[in-house]
Amino acid sequence: GAATGSGGEIRDRLAGGKGSLPLAGTAVYMTSYSRIQKNSKKGSFAERDWLYQNPTDILIKASNGASDFGNKFGQPLIAGSILTFEHKENNQLLGYDKVIMLAGGVGYGKKYEAEKGIPKKGDKIIILGGDNYRIGMGGAAVSSADTGKYGNALELNAIQRSNPEMQKRVSNVIRALVESDINPIVSIHDHGAGGHLNCLSELVENTGGTIEIDSLPLGDPTLSAKEIIGNESQERMGLIISPKDTKKLKKIAERERAPLYIVGEVTCDERLVFKNDTKKEVPIDLDLSALFGSSPKTVMEDSSVFREFKAIPYSQDKLFSYIKQVLQLEAVACKDWLTN
């Protein structure tokens, strides 16, 4: 899951404008206290049941995942931070039980290609990357939901799996197009949260398009139409190019050994259609306004909560002990083991 955070952030930058190029990554972690040092402030917090994994495992494995993806893809993780916090008082326990990992990065794009183009009728819709599997079903929705709202099995089923080698191949194709004298990309979008439904609908949000489900590559033939359309199998990019440029794109994809699929075309009828000619099914046929024009408005109201905490007792002759405890906190100590 952590590796796909770094991988997804790279794809976000690849999808900037008509294509952009990633340079370096960053990572930030927020968890409750780890239980490593028994003689520190954290030692006063006993082990307890964790909803997911304990903070120590998260900090070690998540950072390993983020760094590992960058190493395999060829992008360094150069900076970041960590915050650990936990406090118990008045029968209340405050802490990060649903941990936070923020993946970020640095990249660049050409100024005159900063805005996406408007697709024309007949333009081809392309998928670059791997096959569809029963992976990451509902991942984006689950990650944004209240902790424990879904069962553990469902939440674990929502975790994506990374494939940095595939992403490198796809990235090389996009890089070749971006660095060309004439970039044929009309519009580009990353695959991630929401799978094909999110990616392909946003590619044609101003025009409409038809997607051939038969043309979407299946790694698992048992997938239902919903699973094919909504899975979040990683390392895929969607783009739109003119029919005359497909030959050039295919040659580059073959050179980089990146799977390429022409899965549909722009229709300019302001409808999004997913159809399966083999099974004579049309699982999705929606007016674009149903997806983009009438999104419900979320109203969030906050209220200030005032809490009073007892003064912390201390003894001046224990000053060095206190300093040692503070320096043992991950939020204070050197963070290179996580961020470099």
Language-model features: where?
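Glycine/proline-enriched, intrinsically flexible loops and inter-domain linkers
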Residues: G1-N340
